[in-house]
């Protein structure tokens, strides 16, 4: 064969193939873990923080119980199954925009964007979004998913006569024509902020750089003048530093969350509230609560007062998303010198309002300024705690005797009696069981779930609810069941509880059954953003073999 013909054959048979570029709208990895959702609050006592260190620039889509899309507003730390949740700092694109770049921020230690990276986003024809997510440089960071409000067939949104959905202020209609996505006000004129704009759910806020604070208009910033101006706003000591200044407290007091006010230490527990007042602050005063029979006891360094939510004149109220217990510690001069040698006083009266906050869904002290006149010295003591419930399995329909040592082995035709019981019985409060579901394992985020109660509604017609004398207790009966499969011989129950005020006719508890779409558990405006706690009971062994 001639050389020219051989070369011609070689050139006609060797072809170069162009690499196939796949559309990320059809080539993506699904993220469907329930703990990714913004409703999932991380509890370090129950699990370890998670991290997305396995990601390496692939395309992802949020599906299932993880949510519909990434949140475009700041997510508080300790959500989405980790310490530092990652959110999208920018609006989602339109379908015609193609692939766009957005900043993703991790929230931690009060900073909505302590860490950031760049991700790519694309709006797909099916009304959903895909994301090209980078591997976080440090742990513990997780990319969050979120369920956005939708206009459903029952018109829980604002539906127009044209069957189109009108979204609430701060949101806009997504490409699917029914989902209301959060608007990022910071993308328009920086939200009106002179320096830093932080996008929040349905709103935004302005912030300032180091050494600067917001003016009263909430938009512009001014320099912090330091300790020489009004003591820097510190209730006690003000120390200058290169970055500005910092406040410090005398021994026995602690700095409050505002980083300016020194507080009396207070420990909030459902069983007792403990206030510890430094002896130097008390001097020759005698401390007592609203009920004057409840008095402080000195241990040499502190005067301690311990009381419960039901004693010593404690007042319990429901305020927004919290249960608030309050009392007042009053200090008056002793009639005679005490055994500790107090023979002088430096103030004529001491007032310490004590406040403990507990989350509704299953939470400290201001300055000591010497005052020698007759005006009372006031210190605020404030802290957070947990208002606990237990999920009990009972022996019969009287709901008086729960299984304690060992849980029962039941047959499929038996009745299962279970209930939510408060560890502390407080009048003026009531509860709503927002959801109860069963799993074959003790894991709350188990993929295989069977709902008995959902959105405050009974979702299984065989579930029967019993009345209870205590507004906080809830009792139920359901026929025994098991999960399909010979290996599934146990059943675990998990319930979420919300606490409200009995007299609040507009509360989520008063509304009762409230169906929502695409939610793991019913969430009304009244309970949005509340701290959640899931109660777990079991295992219940099933004797199913005939």
Swiss-Prot record:
UniProt KW keywords: Calcium, Disulfide bond, EGF-like domain, Glycoprotein, Nucleus, Signal
Residue stretches in coiled coil: none
Location(s), subcellular: Nucleus envelope
GO MF: calcium ion binding
Region (Disordered): 524-546
Protein origin, superkingdom: Eukaryota
Annotated glycan sites: 89, 116, 299
GO cellular component: cell surface; extracellular space; nuclear envelope
Classification via SMART domains: EGF, EGF_CA, ZP
Predominant location category: nucleus
InterPro entries named in the record: EGF-like_Ca-bd_dom, EGF-like_dom, ZP-C, ZP-C_dom, ZP-N, ZP_chr, ZP_dom
Limits of the ZP domain: 261-516
An example Gene Ontology biological process: renal system process
Record has Disulfide bond as a keyword: yes
Tagged with keyword Signal: yes
Biological role stated in the UniProt entry: May be involved in hepatocellular function and development.
Name of this protein: Oncoprotein-induced transcript 3 protein
Annotated organism of origin: Rattus norvegicus (Rat)
